[in-house]
């Protein structure tokens, strides 16, 4: 038994704080290496502009692809063995892989390790499942919104810290530093997360068909998975062209990279501020209302982004967009909590993670293809159309299905 465990009832608020710290550490660890990923690919022997772009895209995307494949398996194991065990597995596994990445000698080794990183991931969806099964239902929106800010905070801090560390110590040492962050996450989880879980034998586990039939609204849950996918497609579609769009708007300035970094970061800052507050509001008025309103608000912000004339205008709109984005995934997760039981929470959240990962892969591809054929500004208009479809689709799905009453 760990020092933080005893026979007293589980304090879900303490677990939320520790899970938030774990999501922060894993978010930071994942994003620490992002600023110099193409540079590391080049250091491993890839030369030429086209080859470097291709390999950088592949090693970036393959992690999400393999995460999408592995998530349902880990979700099922979490429902059998417990969510804390999956948190420990994820943190330790990713830490070991990060060490090996720092030792990679060629691009193929690095590619395999990036795929392995995706296979062994899953800290955040399991943290979501753990908190969702412990928190009172009438506080789910606030709790999951608060938890989401952990990963966002880490993702905001990671690139800045990673760039600074790479400049100071070189590229390979950053992987070892990242591994130490993940090992720290492992020990924090080991000693301070409490879970009372009764293991379930494989024979007693619900099969896929039984999972579907046990859901209160199977079609609604599937529509929420699709909503998650589209949210990530919309978010990712802008990523490949943002720096180039900022350069086009800024003209001849020497600090384009700094301006781009600021504009890339402001949505995360806004999401940090909005997610807990809108989650709490969702607990009062219903997460479905928050979801639809945030989607419509996003459409109204994406359209003018196509017509901005200065980086400042783009930055202001992206800040407001971040405030809306901060409500989207927590609202979806809260609706998933309302429409599933604790017995299958691990699998439901892992399926949702798979759809999210697919969106992470397809979004940048969509944005790059649109910008190559129709220009940067068209990306924002097409993305607005995708989000508008998502709003109509979600509204129709939620309208046709009565949201279960929130109970304590």
From Swiss-Prot:
InterPro entries: MFS (IPR011701), MFS_dom (IPR020846), MFS_MdtG_subfamily (IPR050497), MFS_trans_sf (IPR036259), Mutidrug-R_MdtG (IPR023692), Tet-R_TetA/multi-R_MdtG-like (IPR001958). Keywords: Antibiotic resistance, Cell inner membrane, Cell membrane, Membrane, Transmembrane, Transmembrane helix, Transport. The chain crosses the membrane at residues 16-36, 58-78, 92-112, 115-135, 146-166, 173-193, 224-244, 256-276, 290-310, 319-339, 378-398. Its main location: membrane. One of its GO terms (biological process) is response to antibiotic. Confers resistance to fosfomycin and deoxycholate. Belongs to the major facilitator superfamily. DHA1 family. MdtG (TC 2.A.1.2.20) subfamily. This is Multidrug resistance protein MdtG. It comes from Escherichia coli O1:K1 / APEC. The lineage of its organism: Bacteria, Pseudomonadati, Pseudomonadota, Gammaproteobacteria, Enterobacterales. The gene is mdtG.
């Amino acid at each position: 038994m760990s020092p933080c465990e005893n026979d007293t009832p589980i304090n879900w608020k303490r677990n939320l704080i520790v899970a938030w710290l774990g999501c922060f550490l894993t978010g930071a660890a994942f994003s620490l290496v992002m600023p110099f990923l193409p540079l590391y690919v080049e250091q491993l022997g890839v030369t030429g502009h086209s080859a470097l772009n291709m390999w950088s895209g592949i090693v970036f995307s393959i992690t999400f692809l393999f995460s999408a494949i592995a998530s349902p398996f880990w979700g099922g194991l979490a429902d059998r063995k417990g969510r804390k065990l999956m948190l420990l597995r994820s943190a330790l596994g990713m830490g070991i892989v990060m060490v090996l990445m720092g030792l990679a000698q060629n691009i193929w080794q690095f590619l395999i390790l990036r795929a392995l990183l995706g296979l062994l991931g899953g800290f955040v969806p399991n943290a979501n499942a753990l908190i969702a099964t412990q928190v009172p239902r009438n506080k789910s929106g606030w709790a999951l919104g608060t938890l989401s800010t952990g990963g966002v905070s880490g993702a905001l801090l990671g690139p800045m810290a990673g760039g600074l560390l790479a400049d100071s110590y070189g590229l390979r040492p950053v992987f070892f530093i990242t591994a130490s962050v993940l090992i720290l996450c492992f020990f924090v989880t080991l000693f301070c997360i409490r879970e009372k879980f009764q293991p379930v034998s494989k024979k007693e586990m619900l099969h896929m068909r039984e999972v579907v039939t046990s859901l209160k609204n199977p079609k609604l849950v599937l529509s929420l998975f699709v909503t998650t996918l589209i949210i990530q497609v919309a978010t990712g579609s802008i990523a490949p062209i943002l720096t180039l769009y900022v350069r086009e708007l800024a003209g001849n300035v020497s600090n384009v990279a700094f301006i781009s970094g600021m504009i890339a970061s402001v949505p995360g800052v806004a999401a940090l501020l909005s997610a807990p507050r809108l989650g709490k509001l969702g607990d009062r008025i219903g997460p479905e209302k928050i979801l639809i309103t945030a989607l419509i608000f996003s459409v109204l912000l994406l359209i003018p982004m196509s017509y901005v004339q200065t980086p400042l205008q783009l930055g202001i709109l992206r800040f407001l967009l971040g405030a809306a984005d901060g409500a989207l995934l927590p609202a979806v997760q809260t609706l998933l909590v309302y429409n599933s039981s604790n017995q299958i929470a691990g699998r439901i959240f892992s399926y949702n993670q798979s759809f999210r990962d697919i969106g992470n892969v397809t979004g940048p591809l969509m944005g790059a293809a649109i910008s190559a054929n129709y220009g940067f500004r068209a990306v924002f208009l097409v993305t607005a159309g995708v989000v508008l479809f998502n709003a109509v689709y979600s509204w129709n799905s939620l309208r046709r299905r009565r949201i279960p009453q929130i109970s304590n």
